């Protein structure tokens, strides 16, 4: 069977449309690391100063990293979030929100105003988010049912939580599972972390 030139062009255009275009709001060091991982999985990578045309390549995934935010980056995040559709994915990595009040307030503002599909952080960062969003004392929950608060937060915000400690804990509010990432059985820890992002 021979394919016509139009058929081949149609297939290539369809494939280009299905590949994820990921827009990252992060510092330059993080951008370099993520670009390699995203391109390895055939994704297209974009950031504020990239030369990609947003009309030709519509963004379908937004990655937000709160580790080095300034007022200009916050404005870029707001613009990108407003432009996102419901079917597009937004990932928020909650770096440093357990220690800095302005990042905590920014993260809560983003979570409360926009649909965030995935929130990733350490145990203390996620617990800080839960504590300040619910504005309740956490001693009501005993340690034996500690995952209940994660599932409840995930269900309430309609998001997937990825909690990064020795093991990865992932929940969508209804189900939960652990991935042991502390051994180098199949990947090194940095590559595993980038894949979850």
Residue ranges and their predicted role:
Residues 144-188:
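Conserved phosphate-donor
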Residues 55-56, 110-112, 153:
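Structural alpha-helical scaffold elements that stabilize or flank donor/cofactor-binding regions
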Residues 52-53, 98-99, 169:
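Positions that flank functional sites
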Residues 128, 188-197:
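Short, small-residue alpha-helix embedded
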Residues 2-90:
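Conserved N-terminal subdomain of the carbohydrate kinase-like
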Residues 61-63, 69-145:
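Conserved beta-alpha-beta core of the PfkB/ribokinase-like small-molecule kinase fold
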Residues 45-48, 90-94, 118-123, 161-165, ...:
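General beta-strand structural signal in soluble alpha/beta enzymes
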Residues 2-20, 27-34, 38-40, 108-109, ...:
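N-terminal loops that bind phosphate or other acidic moieties
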């Amino acid at each position: 069977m021979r394919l016509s030139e139009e058929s081949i062009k149609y297939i290539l255009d369809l494939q280009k449309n299905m590949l994820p275009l990921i827009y990252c709001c992060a510092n330059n060091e993080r951008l370099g690391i993520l670009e390699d991982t995203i391109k390895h999985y055939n994704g297209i990578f974009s950031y504020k100063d990239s030369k990609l045309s947003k009309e030709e390549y519509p963004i379908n995934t937004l990655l937000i990293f709160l580790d080095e935010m300034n007022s200009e980056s916050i404005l870029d995040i707001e613009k990108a979030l407003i432009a996102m559709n419901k079917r597009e994915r937004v990932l928020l990595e909650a770096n440093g929100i357990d220690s800095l009040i302005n990042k905590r307030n920014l993260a809560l503002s983003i979570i409360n105003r926009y649909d965030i599909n995935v929130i990733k952080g350490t145990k203390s960062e996620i617990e800080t988010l839960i504590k300040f969003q619910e504005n309740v004392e956490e001693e009501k929950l005993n340690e034996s049912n500690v995952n209940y608060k994660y599932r409840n937060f995930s269900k309430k915000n309609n998001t997937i939580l990825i909690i990064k400690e020795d093991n990865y804990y992932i929940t969508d509010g209804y189900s939960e599972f652990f991935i042991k990432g502390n051994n180098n059985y199949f990947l090194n820890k940095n590559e595993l972390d980038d894949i979850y992002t």
